[in-house]
Amino acid sequence: MKKYLIFGATGGIGSKLANQLYEEKKDCHLIGRNEEELKKLANKLNYSFTVCDVLKIDFAKKLVEDLSDTDVIGIAYCVGSIEIKPFKITKARDFVSSYVLNLVAVTDIIRSLLDNLKKNNASVVLFSTVAAKKGFTNHSIISSAKSAVEGLTVSLAAELAPNIRINCIAPSLTKSKMA
């Protein structure tokens, strides 16, 4: 069965995307860590889902098992964070946590599903922020992590073409809880 995967499916962007793809009669598999919200959305849209936290070691292994009979035709990695604070009070762990969530986890996902993605000429959409290029005050944590996402995007787009398309969207403020 051909499906799109939406990571962060219960967030503002992820849930909006899930609803839009439902309206377009596309099949999706929703991924998120909030089990109650994920079940509610999946039941409403009649989508399959996996409760998983991308910050947990071996999360990708469980996901690949859940998707063993699925042809993945697209991934939307709508997971993210925004920690805004003056640089002088940041800690190394702030940067590491943001890099793991925004960059490292998605590399585990893509690597784990690489053969599946290639076979299906899939598309991967990652998210950055305008802060990665604009230099906003107190955005050093998120802008550096999302700049890394943009670097990964152009590198993987070159490396994985023509079988897998990798793109990155860098929105400004959105109408969501996180914003």
What are these regions (language model features)?
Residues 86-87, 91-99:
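Substrate-binding pocket helix/loop in short-chain dehydrogenase/reductase
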Residues 160-174:
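Conserved Rossmann-fold SDR core element
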Residues 10-11:
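Conserved glycine-rich cofactor-binding loop
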Residues 90, 135-143, 155:
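Active-site loop-to-helix junction immediately N-terminal to the catalytic Tyr of the SDR YXXXK motif
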Residues 129:
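Residue(s) in the substrate-gating loop at a strand-loop-helix junction
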Residues 115, 157-162:
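Alpha-helical segment proximal to the catalytic Tyr-Lys
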